Regions:
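Catalytic domains of carbohydrate-active enzymes that cleave complex glycans
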Residues: 102-274
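Mature N-terminal, pre-catalytic/accessory segment of carbohydrate-active enzymes
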Residues: 209-287, 364-369, 389, 395-427, ...
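Beta-propeller fold detector
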Residues: 355-357
Length: 456
């Protein structure tokens, strides 16, 4: 009430990154007794530095007037040239709010920035829009992806054509983009984007072999060739794109084919468990980060936790559960992103849940062993708590395999890692540096070794 009326007050919205809406402005304006100056935290990426946001500018209400907001400022990325596409949209919005159209403005911005490489830049930009967590943005809206079980020849061919376009984008941008400063900023992402195009295209070609079902050897060889190495993943994680549809298609396609292929060989359900939960991203490939046998990676909810939320594992079949090990938090035992009041439960049908342990309080490391319980699903469920942080899990192991539980004799130079050769899960492997000796159980009629390559 006593603040000089000429002083403008910045406001970032309901949360740090949020839309500009009449409701937001009404809330703050009624308290500061003047139209606020809106500080929009977009396209800033200081919370996701491995992304470079190139999508349309939307989330800015077109009914607002100077009576509601006295100004709008955009917080850009540290990449000045790459921020210009979003800044073009923000300027367009503030110039003529009532008639602003996000897609039309975006199309004009692409043309202004790269007049001789617009098509290539557009292909990259439309697939480099989402943040993967937090302030989510639409991405790849013109592209239809699918699971292998939903295969349709026409849809598959259309997606393959898109991946082939993506594969060519880096070279086309190098040739046609006259803004060398923009090209320099985008180049690391363009490089990884092109690789995504290649592995996506090859996943579709691999699926055609898989669906024919008559050439296991050819499928396996091409499957191994199209896997991402540790180095590939590190490079992609550093400069991500296509996170909403394209990379998930690749991951899901490879996983679905691996599951079906191994099930065919085993005659039983493989043990390639899936992450599940109550959060919006619980069904995405992000949950694989708590199942990758690497405690330096983690699954995170990406939104604040609330009572009743849970994180768990689908064992794909009803199994005897005798051991569970969970590491909560992102990277340490003093992290804030965890359930500080929780209970460990299991279920055969996903509806009726049975507690396995008493209520847990402020426990990052959770271990349970007991008599066999028939279950397909295991979960850690949040109970009443004041905590509103994200929830993160570094590791969620159910029935972790131990050498002594294999049922046959085994000798190797690395007893801790060798179990991954026998865990019925194609996402894991064991690298033989010297020799591997194992007993073939009595009554075994066939034995199949799935290998990457042999060095003689």
């Amino acid at each position: 009430n006593s603040l000089n009326p000429d002083i403008k007050v910045f406001w970032t919205g309901d949360v740090v990154c949020s839309d500009l809406t009449p409701e937001t402005m009404e809330w703050i304006n009624s308290r500061i007794k003047r139209p606020a100056y809106y500080w929009w935290n977009y396209p800033v990426t200081d919370y996701i530095r491995n992304f470079i946001l190139q999508g349309p500018v939307y989330g800015l209400d077109t009914s607002l007037t100077k009576e509601n907001v006295c100004g709008v400022v955009s917080n850009p990325m540290e990449h000045g040239e790459a921020s210009k596409l979003a800044l073009y949209g923000v300027a367009d919005y503030t110039w003529n709010i009532a008639n602003y159209n996000p897609i039309d403005s975006w199309e004009r911005g692409l043309q202004e920035l790269t007049p001789k490489a617009k098509d290539a830049y557009r292909t990259f930009a439309i697939h480099s829009s989402d943040t993967e967590n937090g302030y989510r943005r639409d991405e790849s809206w013109e592209t239809k992806t699918f699971r292998i079980a939903e295969w349709n020849d026409a849809t598959a061919q259309a997606l393959k054509t898109e991946f082939e376009k993506i594969e060519k984008v880096p070279a086309e941008m190098e040739q046609g983009c006259e803004n060398k400063a923009l090209l320099q900023e985008l180049r690391p992402w363009l490089t990884e984007f092109g690789k995504l195009g290649t592995r996506g295209k090859q996943a579709i070609e691999l699926a055609q072999i898989y669906r024919s079902g008559n050439d296991d050897s050819s499928f396996w060889n091409k499957y191994v060739q199209n896997l991402m190495s540790k180095e590939d993943r590190k490079a992609y994680e550093a400069h991500k794109s296509g996170t909403l549809k394209l990379q998930p298609f690749y991951e899901n396609a490879m996983d679905d084919m691996a599951h079906g292929f191994l099930k065919k060989l085993l005659g039983t359900t493989p043990k390639d468990y899936k992450g599940i939960g109550s959060f919006g991203n619980s069904g995405t490939i992000l949950t694989k980060l708590m199942l990758d046998n690497d405690t330096t990676t983690y699954y995170t909810s990406g939104i604040g936790q609330k009572e009743g939320d849970w994180i768990g594992v689908d064992l794909r079949d009803i199994r005897d559960v005798t051991e569970i090990s969970i590491l909560q938090g992102r990277n340490s035992v003093d992290d804030v992103d965890y359930f500080d009041h929780a209970i460990l439960e299991c279920s055969a049908d996903g509806k009726t849940w049975t507690p396995l342990i008493k209520e847990l309080n402020k426990q990052y490391v959770i271990n349970w062993k007991g008599d066999a319980v028939k279950a397909r699903y295991v979960r850690l469920k949040r109970l009443e708590s004041e905590r509103k942080n994200y929830a993160s899990v570094r590791s969620f192991e159910v029935n972790p395999l131990h050498v002594e539980n294999l049922g046959f004799k085994l000798e190797s130079e690395n007893p801790q890692q060798v179990v991954y050769a026998f865990d019925q899960n194609l996402s894991t492997f064991y690298k033989v540096s010297n020799t591997l000796t194992f007993e073939v159980p009595q009554g075994t009629k066939t034995y199949t070794l799935l290998m990457d390559k042999l060095s003689v």
